[in-house]
Amino acid sequence: MSPQTETKASVGFKAGVKDYKLTYYTPEYETKDTDILAAFRVTPQPGVPPEEAGAAVAAESSTGTWTTVWTDGLTSLDRYKGRCYHIEPVPGEEDQYICYVAYPLDLFEEGSVTNMFTSIVGNVFGFKALRALRLEDLRIPPTYSKTFQGPPHGIQVERDKLNKYGRPLLGCTIKPKLGLSAKNYGRACYECLRGGLDFTKDDENVNSQPFMRWRDRFVFCAEAIYKAQAETGEIKGHYLNATAGTCEEMMKRAAFARELGVPIVMHDYLTGGFTANTSLSMYCRDNGLLLHIHRAMHAVIDRQKNHGIHFRVLAKALRMSGGDHVHSGTVVGKLEGEREITLGFVDLLRDDFIEKDRSRGVFFTQDWVSMPGVIPVASGGIHVWHMPALTEIFGDDSVLQFGGGTLGHPWGNAPGAVANRVALEACVQARNEGRDLAREGNEIIKAACKWSPELAAACEVWKAIKFEFEPVDTVDKV
């Protein structure tokens, strides 16, 4: 009996392989208001046309597979397939294209960032026909975003809880991040909060290690918070990292934080996972806890310009999954972050309606339809000389977080906190008087040094510290 090479048992079905572009490249398609739209930076293998590469992305991230299958006839591919509807070359980059793909809303489970990412980026990034692939942006339609609860509280509710208005909030990551005992850790928290900071913070990898178990840390940090509050009359907080090896353990830690009466907990949302993050966010909403989000592992995913997922996509996903703060880079510190790109995704975190603006990397107009905003956290290699630039770049609805820039003060932790608070108050006052922080920042800080010896000492220590490297990820020429 000869081998079967073609099946003719069903009218209209023919086994075999055909080009993706015959089905999934549809330049005539008009996008719907309910479609999820994606902008991919595609680098095809030599000899692969951009239309075929874009169609392959649309197919492999929706209904397609490498060959025609029988069961295509049991559903409506026109209803469910992703469509590559537009392709444009990237200026100044050889063999790179921005491919726009539209996905029908029915492809995605309601309220699940996990399912959304599994569909759109779960499998296609290993496709052999592509040399590299990067998800640059997503347009989340209101029809889908309304299935998410979003941040537990949002910017305005946080300000009301803390009773702090008209300025950025100040934070500090306790250093060294690993190795301190719980009591010494709590002591450092107290000194920083007593000196004038609003928050102190667990670093991303502080969980429950042999040198400091989580329950001991929570208790000593709570004691530090209450003592500092009593002495300053200000509401204080410490980001207690609830991230754990299981969701059950994470929720147990969050519940203990609630029992202690502290205002905020923390989660590493990329290493912990979106399912865990959404669960924790819902718990925080129901129990009055603010939720600080660390983006540990993000640069593994987002730093390379031609492959991965841009952070603006991860930021949108976090806003849907839930978090009241998220780290966003500093522009001026030690970590990667070009100014216009950073401001683009900061707007996507905070604002209700964001217009398309390719000069800042925003590929689609995004309407969050009143979903609460997320406060961006500037953290990483910043000190008092950066305060004018940070205040000017990030504005009031931000957290400026100085770890080494507080604990590295030559006189100790509390004077380091005083220096940062004085620098911030001076910058806010100067801005409110109409002065140009970008141009007059150094003069403003020097003037404040005359009546703050703590600030003067900090300025002397860090006067020559700069992190001047060209960013890897930059805006495309348009």
Swiss-Prot record:
Gene: rbcL
Propeptide: 1-2
Reactions performed catalytically: 2 (2R)-3-phosphoglycerate + 2 H(+) = D-ribulose 1,5-bisphosphate + CO2 + H2O; D-ribulose 1,5-bisphosphate + O2 = 2-phosphoglycolate + (2R)-3-phosphoglycerate + 2 H(+)
Gene Ontology cellular component list: chloroplast
The protein's name in its UniProt record: Ribulose bisphosphate carboxylase large chain
Modified residues (N6-carboxylysine): 201
Family annotation (Gene3D superfamilies): Ribulose bisphosphate carboxylase, large subunit, C-terminal domain, RuBisCO large subunit, N-terminal domain
Binding site for substrate: 123, 173, 177, 295, 327, 379
Names of the cofactor(s): Mg(2+)
Enzyme Commission numbers on file: 4.1.1.39
GO molecular function: magnesium ion binding; monooxygenase activity; ribulose-bisphosphate carboxylase activity
Function statement: RuBisCO catalyzes two reactions: the carboxylation of D-ribulose 1,5-bisphosphate, the primary event in carbon dioxide fixation, as well as the oxidative fragmentation of the pentose substrate in the photorespiration process. Both reactions occur simultaneously and in competition at the same active site.
GO biological process, any: photorespiration
Entry note: cofactor: Binds 1 Mg(2+) ion per subunit.
Organism from which the protein derives: Neurachne munroi
Site (Transition state stabilizer) location in chain: 334
Binding site for Mg(2+): 201, 203-204
Residues of the active site: 175 (proton acceptor), 294 (proton acceptor)
Post-translational modifications reported in the UniProt record: The disulfide bond which can form in the large chain dimeric partners within the hexadecamer appears to be associated with oxidative stress and protein turnover.
